[in-house]
Amino acid sequence: MSNAVSSSVFGEKNNSVAYELPWVEKYRPIVLDDIVGNEETIDRLKVIAKEGNMPHLVISGMPGIGKTTSILCLAHALLGPAYKEGVLELNASDERGIDVVRNRIKAFAQKKVILPPGRHKIIILDEADSMTAGAQQALRRTMEIYSNTTRFALACNQSNKIIEPIQSRCAILRYSRLTDQQVLQRLLNICKAEKVNYTDDGLAALIMTAEGDMRQAVNNLQSTVAGFGLVNGENVFRVADQPSPVAIHAMLTACQSGNIDVALEKLQGIWDLGFSAVDIVTNMFRVVKTMDSIPEFSRLEMLKEIGQTHMIILEGVQTLLQLSGLVCRLAKSQMKPESFII
């Protein structure tokens, strides 16, 4: 009796737990019309979906702008109910050496599947630029042999890492970075659907940290809601683990006024929070671009200094000394010549 009661209680408890999808998947477009940005390229995919004759495709562009989603939407439009049987998707988490090309991909290409008239099986290779050169050479031959029944769609960040023989067999589509307005509109739609409490500076912070990456923006939005319940600038930067633009702005303002001691003190405060040199320099670059109070010529000089320091840091010299030298050079570039007269 007691066992039955306890099991029913546990059953109710388990049923009450709501497992929510990540918003990236929950709000992933399922038709081409819902994809944000890159209208011209999407229009070409719509023509392919309408005519039904899909060529081999290479879609390149930065992460989080809809490359894989576009291919999945195209596959759904072409195959309809036969999607599950007619599509093989391999992403970066799958082993994709020569053995996979020779065995798994070849086996799928040989498999007989009932598809709508005039349609082909589709093999989707996400992050194809991470495939080894040997695997790409093996893939080239597979593409040739099974082109009558199978089409390949490759998504990559850099198309130049795809070997030339594969590029020559494919139609290459290049996706551009999403604009801030496009990212903002999708975030507003999600906030409305999820009844999210947000502020304007919170949305601005999401856009700034995402840098055109829609996936990053949506992930940061969900993480901020889950962690704090309110999407404002401070909470977003805590979730994104990036230096606050307010602190960066204060440091750069001190540089602009030639107050080196205050600027170095602000830098030390940011450094003590544990941020890397790359994070600090990257955010300095973002903030300087938005500082309208600085004359354009001075801004260009500051951006030049920040860019040179960024290059040094990427070579491995990620020290506070490098950042301090940058701050001093920025302050010096804003000082008047008479300040140097002894």
Curated annotation (Swiss-Prot):
The keyword Nucleotide-binding applies. GO terms for biological process: DNA repair; DNA strand elongation involved in mitotic DNA replication; DNA-templated DNA replication; mitotic DNA replication leading strand elongation; UV-damage excision repair. Coiled coil: none annotated. The keyword Mitochondrion does not apply. Transmembrane segments: none annotated. Gene3D superfamilies: 1.10.8.60, 1.20.272.10, P-loop containing nucleotide triphosphate hydrolases (3.40.50.300). It is found in: Nucleus. One of its GO terms (molecular function) is DNA binding. One of its GO terms (cellular component) is chromatin. Keywords: ATP-binding, Cell cycle, DNA replication, DNA-binding, Nucleotide-binding, Nucleus. ATP binds at V24, V36, G61, M62, P63, G64, I65, G66, K67, T68, N157, R215. The elongation of primed DNA templates by DNA polymerase delta and epsilon requires the action of the accessory proteins PCNA and activator 1. Heteropentamer of subunits rfc1, rfc2, rfc3, rfc4 and rfc5 that forms a complex (RFC) with PCNA in the presence of ATP. Two other complexes exist where rfc1 can be replaced by either ctf18 or elg1 to form the ctf18-RFC or the elg1-RFC complexes respectively. Belongs to the activator 1 small subunits family. This is Replication factor C subunit 4. It comes from Schizosaccharomyces pombe (strain 972 / ATCC 24843).
